[in-house]
């Protein structure tokens, strides 16, 4: 199924006909196309290939794929009966598609928990199906509601922070990867906070002495989710933004925060006051696994917050809060520190090649090409995620009205 109309709906689930489609995010922003997910194997491939990505979204797709597979099985009249053990084996297999993101494992383990009341040799029937269906629907609906709460809570934290700093005037926010509607059931986590903040704090409607002027999404190499997906969402929402490469962050922040320096080819100079990121796993002490490059952003924020630059007259402009935004389902209290998080490594060709459509001089989209950008046969290290130490995180915003901040000892208390 294809459409020429842009949409921010990453997951389409037909609750009446039990059909699941996902937006193929590998084709964005040049083509909007939905692909069917007919079973668990389809979901595994789509998640592994990153046709769907974002910790909340892959959990939802994983759960819905189980619903679709069981529904299709129950419609069959053949004698190939599936047992609880068969389904548990399929769930364990699906978990391995993206090991770092805890949401997928949590959702599928919840389904496994539903199955524990049955014997492994029991045949899957309508009662089991209805329980799985109800769980998946609740997962989707709660994620959407929680994302909106994350946006509201993040907005309040931003207002409180800037008010406490007695900050006035325009400010900017920086983010990495994609954490919006394309990574969730809707609205988003980190991008959801940005969306909520822009709605409330535009220059022409802000009730505060400050307003959100600009967003800086990082390109997010090597998969370019920031360039392809976050810009797609920001453009759709008509939120002012400028795309930057991952290695431009320090220079941009320094330039924007100094009144004596004028940005080159940037028509505004609102200082970056917040770096807001998502999370694929937050462990008990607050260490956070997120898209590769997140750790780097936290160290840059820490540099500007503690460096000698803060003795200047523009010290307030250089104070940057590093915020992690995620639903509480992303918090893993069974893992003590970030050292224990399994980091997924991606194929070398994702770093040594670029994949995208051929564009002619008029910008018309042509065939998809793979272009080499590195010496063939070289050694490549390509982790999908890194771990940001809790020491470098200022706050963790969830759907809980209480924003998690550190105590006087610099420790988070993330007990749900």
Swiss-Prot record:
Catalyzed reactions: 5-(methylsulfanyl)-alpha-D-ribose 1-phosphate = 5-(methylsulfanyl)-D-ribulose 1-phosphate
Primary location recorded for the protein, binned into one broad class: cytoplasm
Enzyme kind, highest EC tier: isomerase
Site feature Transition state stabilizer, where: 177
Pathway terms, separated by semicolons: Amino-acid biosynthesis; L-methionine biosynthesis via salvage pathway; L-methionine from S-methyl-5-thio-alpha-D-ribose 1-phosphate: step 1/6
Entry-linked InterPro entries: IF-2B-related, IF-M1Pi, IF_2B-like_C, Initiation_fac_2B_a/b/d, M1Pi_N, NagB/RpiA_transferase-like
Single biological process term from Gene Ontology: L-methionine salvage from methylthioadenosine
Keyword Amino-acid biosynthesis belongs to the record: yes
SUPFAM superfamilies assigned to the protein according to its UniProt record, in alphabetical order: NagB/RpiA/CoA transferase-like
Active-site residues, as the UniProt record annotates them: 280 (proton donor)
Top-level lineage group: Eukaryota
Family of this protein: Belongs to the eIF-2B alpha/beta/delta subunits family. MtnA subfamily.
Name of the molecule in the record: Methylthioribose-1-phosphate isomerase
Native organism: Candida albicans (strain SC5314 / ATCC MYA-2876)
Source organism phylogeny: Eukaryota, Fungi, Dikarya, Ascomycota, Saccharomycotina
């Amino acid at each position: 199924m294809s459409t020429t109309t842009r949409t921010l709906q990453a997951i389409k689930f037909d609750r009446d006909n039990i059909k699941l489609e996902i937006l193929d995010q590998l084709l964005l922003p040049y083509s909007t196309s939905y692909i069917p997910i007919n079973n668990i194997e389809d979901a595994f491939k789509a998640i592994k290939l990153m046709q769907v990505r974002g910790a909340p979204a892959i959990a939802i797709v994983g759960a819905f794929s189980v619903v679709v597979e069981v529904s299709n099985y129950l419609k069959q009249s053949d004698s190939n009966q599936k047992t609880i053990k068969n389904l548990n084996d399929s769930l364990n297999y699906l978990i391995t598609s993206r090991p770092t993101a805890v949401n997928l494992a949590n959702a599928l383990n919840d389904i496994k928990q539903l199955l524990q009341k049955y014997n492994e040799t029991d045949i899957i029937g309508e009662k089991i199906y209805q329980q799985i269906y109800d769980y998946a629907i609740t997962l989707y609906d709660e994620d959407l509601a929680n994302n909106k709460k994350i946006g509201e809570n993040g907005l309040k934290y931003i207002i409180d922070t800037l008010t406490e700093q007695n900050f006035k005037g325009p400010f900017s926010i920086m983010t990495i990867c994609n954490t919006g509607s394309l990574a969730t059931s809707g609205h988003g986590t980190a991008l959801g906070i940005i969306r909520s903040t822009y709605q409330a704090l535009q220059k022409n409607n802000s009730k505060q002495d400050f307003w959100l002027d600009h967003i800086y999404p990082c390109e997010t190499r090597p998969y370019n989710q920031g360039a392809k997906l976050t810009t797609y969402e920001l453009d759709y929402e008509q939120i002012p933004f400028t795309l930057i490469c991952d290695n431009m962050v320090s220079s941009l922040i320094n330039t924007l925060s100094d009144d004596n320096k004028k940005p080159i080819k940037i028509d505004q100079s609102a200082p970056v006051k917040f770096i807001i990121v998502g999370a694929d796993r937050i462990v008990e002490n607050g260490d956070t696994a997120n898209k590769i490059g997140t750790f780097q952003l936290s160290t840059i924020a820490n540099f500007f917050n503690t460096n000698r630059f803060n003795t200047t007259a523009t010290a307030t402009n250089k104070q940057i809060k590093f915020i992690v935004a995620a639903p509480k389902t992303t918090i893993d209290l069974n893992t003590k520190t970030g050292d224990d998080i399994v980091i997924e490594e991606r194929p070398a060709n994702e770093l040594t090649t670029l994949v995208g459509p051929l564009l002619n001089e008029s910008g018309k989209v042509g065939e998809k090409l793979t272009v080499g950008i590195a010496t063939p046969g070289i050694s490549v290290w390509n982790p999908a995620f890194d771990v940001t130490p809790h020491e470098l995180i200022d706050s963790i915003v969830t759907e809980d009205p209480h924003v998690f901040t550190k105590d006087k000892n610099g420790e988070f208390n993330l007990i749900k």
